[in-house]
Curated annotation (Swiss-Prot):
Pfam families: CoaE
Protein name (database record): Dephospho-CoA kinase
Family as reported in the entry's similarity comment: Belongs to the CoaE family.
Involved pathway(s): Cofactor biosynthesis; coenzyme A biosynthesis; CoA from (R)-pantothenate: step 5/5
Physiological role: Catalyzes the phosphorylation of the 3'-hydroxyl group of dephosphocoenzyme A to form coenzyme A.
Phylogenetic classification of the source organism: Bacteria, Pseudomonadati, Pseudomonadota, Gammaproteobacteria, Vibrionales
Gene Ontology process terms (BP): coenzyme A biosynthetic process
Location(s), subcellular: Cytoplasm
Keywords: ATP-binding, Coenzyme A biosynthesis, Cytoplasm, Kinase, Nucleotide-binding, Transferase
Catalytic activity: 3'-dephospho-CoA + ATP = ADP + CoA + H(+)
CC annotations in GO: cytoplasm
UniProt cross-references to InterPro entries, sorted A to Z: Depp_CoAkinase, P-loop_NTPase
Sections of the chain in a coiled coil: none
Species: Vibrio vulnificus (strain YJ016)
């Protein structure tokens, strides 16, 4: 299997931008946990069937897709329902990510997982790459991007692993603090490093 680089970072750190640059400039295959999480509850999936069985058919939209807003409301006030959902979906997501990683054709793959640290998914990775920004940058970017207030962003930050926890697990770090920092140069340097490592990994 290809060398697996786990790419993570807090909210608004620039994970998607970094992943896209790896893909656009170096044709690196990406397995994105957010996309996989949507796939395992797509219409016709075992995941969606189990959710409907548990919550009832009104958890679906008219088109037969999962009504995420409805689901969020259901689990928000009921911790046991959230636990049930996580127990169902996390193993499915993990299995699908492993399957997708096995299909990779590039010398190494990026496994993009926002909650890599929180869900202890570093076991799927050969290395962990953290996109790092200061908290004040996360606050400003999220407020600008999502139109939310500081209190809401702080609540999200509190629910995620801390910057310190992420950096403690990092093998490599990309600084994405300002537009002045050359993201592509940092990515190019890491690409060369990962290529060399992937040759040793064969």
């Amino acid at each position: 299997m290809a060398l697996v680089i786990g790419l993570t970072g807090g909210i608004a750190s620039g994970k998607t931008t970094v992943a896209n640059l790896f893909q656009q400039h170096f044709a690196i295959d990406i397995v994105d946990a957010d996309i996989v999480a949507r796939q395992v509850v797509a219409p016709g999936s075992a995941g969606l069937a189990a959710i409907v069985d548990h919550f009832g058919a009104d958890i679906l939209t008219r088109e037969g897709e999962l009504d995420r807003g409805q689901l969020r409301q259901r689990i928000f006030a009921h911790a046991e329902e959230k636990q049930w959902l996580n127990a169902l979906l996390h193993p499915m997501i993990r299995r699908k990510m492993i399957e997708d990683l096995a299909q990779v054709s590039s010398p190494y793959a990026l496994l993009v997982v926002p909650l890599l640290v929180e869900n202890q998914l570093q076991t799927l990775c050969d290395r962990v790459l953290v996109v790092d920004v200061e908290e004040k940058t996360q606050l400003q970017r999220t407020m600008d991007r999502d139109g939310v207030d500081e209190q809401q962003v702080r609540a999200i930050l509190k629910a995620q692993a801390s910057r310190h926890e992420r950096l403690a697990l990092a093998d490599d770090v990309i600084k994405n603090e300002s537009k002045d920092q050359d993201l592509l140069q940092q990515i190019t340097d890491l690409h060369q490093k990962y290529l060399a490592m992937s040759k040793q990994n064969r």
